[in-house]
Amino acid sequence: MEIIIISGRSGAGKSVALRALEDTGYYCVDNIPLDLLPQLTDILSQSQSSVAISLDIRNIPNSAHSLKQTLSTLQKHHQIKIIFLEADRATLIRRYSDSRRLHPLSLKDLSLEAAIDEEYRYLEPLIQHANLILDTTHLSTHSLAERLREFLRGNSEKELKIIVESFGFKYGIPLDADYVFDVRFLPNPHWDPTLRPMTGLEAPVAEFLNSHTEVNEFIYLTRHYIDTWLPMLEKNNRSYLTIAIGCTGGKHRSVYIAQQLGEYFQAKGKTVKIQHKSLERNKKIIKSAVIKTLFLLTALFLHAHRLYNFTRITA
């Protein structure tokens, strides 16, 4: 029997994930103590072929040894996959504030911030066993469901999906990255006033970086490193490999290099998704600022219009 265990930080999207799996045909069980899983799976295996089980902090044993023992017992008889959902601290705080729900560990008289930090410490042993760590910080419910469907399709096809992403260190390291490469030591187009407004996807920035031997050497050596270990990673029953390339702001160097690496592996016939996290983040910020500006201008126009009409009437 195939068993998908959904766990992760409270507020990271476990309920959404479980509903998405239910929609794809999995028999779903929410929040059962881990110690009862062997008995539950024995019963379900008589009538079900695919089961998804959600575990939260309240149902995971305190002992890392007990956790490992229970998972080992299950893996002897079933195909187990563990999906761990993650999100950054600020996002979790905002989600709890929006939902007005209590964090499970808040019952221990902890503040929300302290409860979030304490929960992560409890969950660390489970993270070590995860087949997929999914950062939901910037994912909508629909995007999360789609990533899970991609993961499940990857399981059935036994095909490794490669995600190459650029990011800015000033915004934080992506939590779902398997490999992180720091390119902040490479020549920076930011210091050229003509290149500063551009991104690593634009030709002048690409030409600038391509003209430096150290940039080309870094790309070559990174490609060689991944090429060397990719066959073993593919044999290791993984569904995703996330490679993160970081520079200071995630605008020039990391974008160019991530694009080069992604296109290289695409040309080799691999399934590759290229994404630029900081560029996408800045687009959302600009879009939000534009909407707010338009809203403010509309409000000012309406106010001026009313004031004009009032002045004309009273004149």
From Swiss-Prot:
Q: List the disulfide bonds.
A: none
Query: Per the similarity annotation, which family is this?
Result: Belongs to the RapZ-like family.
Residues the record lists as binding ATP: 8-15
Protein name according to UniProt: Nucleotide-binding protein CGSHiEE_06315
Q: Note the superkingdom of the native organism.
A: Bacteria
Check the record and name the InterPro entries matching this protein. P-loop_NTPase, RapZ-like, RapZ-like_N, RapZ_C
Kindly list the positions annotated as binding GTP: 56-59
> Which SUPFAM superfamilies does the UniProt record give?
P-loop containing nucleoside triphosphate hydrolases (SSF52540)
Q: Which UniProt keywords apply?
A: ATP-binding, GTP-binding, Nucleotide-binding
Task: Enumerate the GO terms in the molecular function aspect.
Answer: ATP binding; GTP binding
User: In UniProt terms, what function does this protein have?
Assistant: Displays ATPase and GTPase activities.
